[in-house]
C-alpha cells in the first residue's frame, strides 16, 4: 500500500505542476501586452536639416572670368563659354574691334574688383564689379549678373550692357 500511496502522491504532484503550467499559459494566451507611448511635449518643432549654402561663385572665379573677357589677345569667337548663350559671329567681330581699339588707345589693361556677391534667381548671382584702367579717372562700378550653366558665366543682358558702356 505504501507503493500505491507513493504513486498517488507522485500523480498528485504532477497534476499540480501541470495545472500550474496550464494556468500560466492561459494568462499568456490572453494576447500580447501593448504598451502605449504617452507624449511628453506638445508643439515642439522637429529639428530640420541645416540650410544648404547658396550656390554663389567666389570673387576669384568672377575676376578670372572678367579678365578672360577683357583679354585682347584672345578673339571673342573663342570666348563663347564666358557669356550666357554664347557669342555670335557679328557680336564677336564688334567686340574684337572695340577691344583692339581700346588697346590701341591705351585704355587697357583693365583691372576688376568683385564685391557683394549675392545669390539671385535659381542658378544665378549678382555682384558689384568695379573696373579701373589707365584712362579711367576713378573706378566704374556696375551691378552685374552671372549665371551658372555648368560653370559661371556673364549673363547675356549684363554682357550687352557692358559692351554698350565700353562703346561710350
UniProtKB/Swiss-Prot annotation:
Upper lineage is: Bacteria, Bacillati, Actinomycetota, Actinomycetes, Mycobacteriales
Residue ranges annotated as propeptide in the record: 23-48
Q: Residue span of the signal peptide, if any?
A: 1-22
State any GO CC term. extracellular region
Where does it localize?
Secreted
Family stated for the protein in its record: Belongs to the MTB12 family.
Q: Which organism is it from?
A: Mycobacterium tuberculosis (strain CDC 1551 / Oshkosh)
Name of the featured protein: Low molecular weight antigen MTB12
Going by the UniProt record, its keywords in alphabetical order are: Secreted, Signal
User: What is known about what this protein does?
Assistant: May play a role in the development of protective immune responses.
Amino acid at each position: 500500500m505504501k507503493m500505491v500511496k507513493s504513486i498517488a502522491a507522485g500523480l498528485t504532484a504532477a497534476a499540480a505542476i501541470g495545472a500550474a503550467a496550464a494556468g500560466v499559459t492561459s494568462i499568456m494566451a490572453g494576447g500580447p501586452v501593448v504598451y502605449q507611448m504617452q507624449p511628453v511635449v506638445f508643439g515642439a518643432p522637429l529639428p530640420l536639416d541645416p540650410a544648404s549654402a547658396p550656390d554663389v561663385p567666389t570673387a576669384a572665379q568672377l575676376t578670372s572670368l572678367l579678365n578672360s573677357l577683357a583679354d585682347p589677345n584672345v578673339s571673342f569667337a573663342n570666348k563663347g563659354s564666358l557669356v550666357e548663350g554664347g557669342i555670335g559671329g557679328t557680336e564677336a567681330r564688334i567686340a574684337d574691334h572695340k577691344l583692339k581699339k581700346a588697346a590701341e588707345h591705351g585704355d587697357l589693361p583693365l583691372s576688376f574688383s568683385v564685391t557683394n556677391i549675392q545669390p539671385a534667381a535659381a542658378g544665378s548671382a549678382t555682384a558689384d564689379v568695379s573696373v579701373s584702367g589707365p584712362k579711367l579717372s576713378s573706378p566704374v562700378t556696375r551691378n552685374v549678373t552671372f549665371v551658372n550653366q555648368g560653370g559661371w558665366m556673364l549673363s547675356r543682358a549684363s554682357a550687352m550692357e557692358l559692351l554698350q558702356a565700353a562703346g561710350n
